[in-house]
Curated annotation (Swiss-Prot):
Belongs to the light-harvesting chlorophyll a/b-binding (LHC) protein family. The gene is LHCB4.3. It is a multi-pass membrane protein. This is Chlorophyll a-b binding protein CP29.3, chloroplastic. One of its GO terms (biological process) is photosynthesis, light harvesting. The LHC complex consists of chlorophyll a-b binding proteins. Chlorophyll a 3 binds at L181, E242. It comes from Arabidopsis thaliana (Mouse-ear cress). The N-terminus of the protein extends into the stroma where it is involved with adhesion of granal membranes and post-translational modifications; both are believed to mediate the distribution of excitation energy between photosystems I and II. Chlorophyll a 2 binds at H144.
Length: 276
């Protein structure tokens, strides 16, 4: 009876039923409601070979990388001191007793632990199996790193050309009005902020509509005008170089922020003071 009912429900609610203990008659159900038409999942990417020899580069000499950082990701140096990238584990329960002929129905026991597969399975609502999984963290690392590279270069260039530290640039805009390369702009600072919010927000909405994890972080096309990624043999080298520069830029901008907070100087003026 229970099997027949579960089979009928599977066609309505999209339940996947499997037998966790063959021969015991127990069943397990995982509910997956779907709204609208699902996009087909992208073809699986060819996984990189895991570096399992003793010559693997790690973030600190002699450090032991955690098991979930196996070297398969580009730029993986085994650094995860807080275990943020550890795969989530879920308890697997048996069905509660629902026999109307019994005086008492007992709750289902814990029959095991489920760990999500490392294989990425996009859905219409999210591109990753785990919202806070290691693939999601890699995407965030790259995007923050790209912003940090732009910010670091901008902070140095602006101070070198104008003599105004990056943390004081907003004050100048409030006093003298908005300008670009010395030329006044016909917009107030508030208008410029709204323009930035709308433009960046639109770009982020478009990026988040992409379900292919590879295209989310490496879109190509207009973002590769020189066609540097056209050569598959050089692609991994370029990805490694980008993640290295991203990490360096994030550390550099953190130093810029601490420097501004404690000394009130920008990177160029602080370097000049240090040299003197």
């Amino acid at each position: 009876m229970a099997t027949t009912t579960a089979a009928a429900a599977s066609g309505i609610f999209g339940i996947r039923i499997q037998d966790p203990r063959p021969g015991t008659g127990r069943v397990q159900a995982r509910f997956g409601f779907s709204f609208g038409k699902k996009k087909p999942a992208p073809p699986p990417k060819k996984s990189r070979q895991v570096q399992d020899d003793g010559d693997r580069l790690v973030w600190f000499p002699g450090a032991n990388p955690p098991e979930w950082l196996d070297g398969s990701m580009i730029g993986d140096r085994g650094f995860d001191p807080f275990g943020l990238g550890k795969p989530a584990e879920y308890l697997q329960y048996d069905f509660d007793g629902l026999d109307q002929n019994l005086a008492k129905n007992v709750a289902g026991d814990i029959i095991g632990i489920i760990q999500e597969s490392s294989e990425i399975k996009p859905t219409p609502f999210q591109p990753y199996t785990e919202v806070f999984g290691i693939q999601r963290f890699r995407e965030c690392e790259l995007i923050h790193g790209r912003w940090a590279m732009l910010g670091t270069l901008g902070a140095i260039a602006v101070e070198a050309l104008t003599g105004i530290a990056w943390q004081d640039a907003g004050k100048v805009e409030l006093v003298e009005g908005s300008s670009y390369l010395g030329q006044p702009l016909p917009f107030s600072l508030t208008t410029l902020i709204w323009i930035e919010v709308l433009v960046v927000g639109y770009i982020e909405f478009q990026r988040n509509s992409e379900l292919d994890p590879e295209k989310r972080i490496y879109p190509g096309g207009y973002f590769d005008p020189l066609g540097l990624a056209a050569d598959p043999e050089k692609l991994d080298t370029l990805k490694l170089a980008e993640i290295k520069h991203s990490r360096l830029a994030m550390v550099a901008f953190l130093i810029f922020a601490l420097q501004a907070a404690f000394t009130g100087k920008g990177p160029v003026s602080f370097l000049a003071t240090f040299n003197n």
